[in-house]
Amino acid sequence: MCQGSICPWRGPLPLLHVRTWIEPVVASTQVATSLYDAGLLLVVKASFGVGPSSNHSSSPSPRGALEDEQQRAISNFYIVYHLVMGLTPLLSAYGLGWLSDRYHRKVSICVPLLGFLLSRLVLLLKVLLDWPVEMLYAGAALTGLCGGFSAFWSGVMALGSLSSSEGRRSLRLIVIDLILGLAGFCGSMVSGHLFKQMVGHSKQGLVLTACSVSCATCALLYSLFVLKVPESKAKPRKAVDIVPGTVGRYDTLDPDQTDKQSVVRPPPPPAMAKSKQIIIGLLFVGAIIYDLAVVGTVDVIPLFVLREPLSWNQVQVGYGMASGYTIFITSFLGVLVFSRYFQDTTMIMIGMVSFASGALLLAFVKETYMFYIARAIMLFALIPITTIRSAMSKLIKGSSYGKVFVTLQLSLTLTGVVTSTLYNKIYQLTMEKFIGTCFALSSFLSFLAILPIGIVAYKQASWLQPGDITEK
């Protein structure tokens, strides 16, 4: 049967539950972010411009040299930008997570949203006042000092975990990712068209950046005045968890199913508790290695599509970014199906293989249609990180969600900073010889990330014993 929080049309009480949904904040924020990301790339490209470009241009070598110089300038800009964006949250993100756990869950959501709004305003002012491109670093710093994406997403994951039962948590968190993906898809699809609204005008990009600021403002106001913190879904049980320390297996998507299960075994011994810590560590390692591959690929793709052999224009750039967000939809469908039959570790490995295969094909892309085929192969690429978060949430106390999630997110952010710098330098060194080098490296790292997850799966299998779980 549908419950109030699932069926909001069933009366005034469910209407209160609607205010606990984090999805409107995620959607507004992601539309603003997708518009901002496209606008940032196109504004920076225009700032280092070499004149108008056409798709698949066959220009003489002097123009090719200018385009290479433009690529290096854009790449160097993003190296500094990602360094600022990645390092400044270290000053505030964990503190916001601690305040969120101790005082109010909305702290780690509202403060980062303020930073997002300020950075969007900086881009808008750059377009309006023709500021130097270096002023965009200030916008990145403001975002980071307010916690950045690390604090924001950890807050979103904490609220999502609190509002879901353990048996439904992977699905709940992937639904949030689905909303993020749909919003990003919509924003990216229109970004190129919005950027061209004032083509040839000195304020090109004004409409795009203004829309980004508007969406960021809506997200902040909603989180301040409408959003309510949900009550924890945790219920007292007559028995301990299904199998202490394991990463759950979903035989059903019924959120109450886990409450119907009982265990006829004593509390876990100290060795089991230590194994739980080892599993958390292995999940961290797997997440970090996989994130290295993903971040490196995501950072290089915008540069890759602007250069030959693709040489995309503004609208094509928007469509290409939108194709990346379709992964959120396919990953959601993947979790919806796989969670009925597979353990979390199996789903994680499926996602890693999916991304690794797509990245390998991306290394050899020569035409636009090949790019979209490679992106289609990555259809389950989002499953690993989201499922790892869900798996970790089952091994920690609810009161520690904020700190653990922000620690994971900060770890991913730090590795992302290193990866961004490394990949951009590798791209600059190899773009004239083999432009797909970075993608081949990402494929290797993604396959490598399967190893720690496989160890987790092996440890789980050694714990499972016949008769451990009995139905009431």
Model feature map: region roles:
Residues 114-131, 353-366:
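C-terminal ends and interior cores of transmembrane alpha-helices
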Residues 27, 119, 130-151, 288, ...:
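Hydrophobic core of transmembrane alpha-helices in multi-pass small-molecule transporters
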Residues 168-196, 215-216, 409-421:
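Glycine-rich segments within core transmembrane alpha-helices of 12-TM secondary carriers
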Residues 215-230, 440-472:
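Multi-pass alpha-helical transporter architecture, strongest
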Residues 139-179:
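Cytoplasmic helix-loop-helix junction between adjacent transmembrane helices
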Residues 89-91, 317-341, 351, 355, ...:
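Transmembrane alpha-helices of Major Facilitator/SLC transporters
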Residues 85-105, 195-196, 330-344, 427-428:
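Helix-to-loop junctions at the C-terminal end of transmembrane segments
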Residues 195-215, 425-447:
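A membrane-interface helix-boundary motif in multi-pass transporters
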